């Protein structure tokens, strides 16, 4: 996935400013930022839920209706139809990604076991706990084996046990060769799972690079394009022991 110079405005308010992003195949990219920083707007732009200026390409191609079938998306706001059964709900949305009923019947039990969903295929969505409903939503995201997986706050609301289950599934999808992007407020999740990190503040990218490089970058320089990025926020980054401003107006992290 490649994004170049992505910009977005709602009315007279600009919310994304020249965002560049690269997510490699078989890699996990962590998108970090406060609420309102622009993370979900980036996701919605990739999915073409919004008009935007800039360039977004998946596998070198623009996102089209056919390309969209190669994307799996877990929204921050989970939305399922309470009166449908688990099977009906998954079949309905998987069909939009090109899956047949027979394929859903074959794959759904395996996914329910993998994610430890407590329930039967014939159980109504409304009868499930919130945690199990979230797992069903995740099955819908992954069952068609998408090339690009977008997870908006995937660990929100999960207990520690189910968080570890989801982390294992994310690793397995990476091994399958999927490109994965997820947003999170918790740096420990990003450090544990991600190959690369992109930090966004007020619609602008303020930090990007390999997580391993950030973790081991004692004494190396990081450049930030946002001059109002606070020293306290930088000092909160993993393994940063000292933050100083250079004469050029960039931050040096040690």
Give residue spans per PLM region.
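Conserved ABC ATPase "signature" region
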Residues: 91, 95, 102-120
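Conserved ABC ATPase signature
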Residues: 124-131
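ABC transporter nucleotide-binding domain
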Residues: 168-252
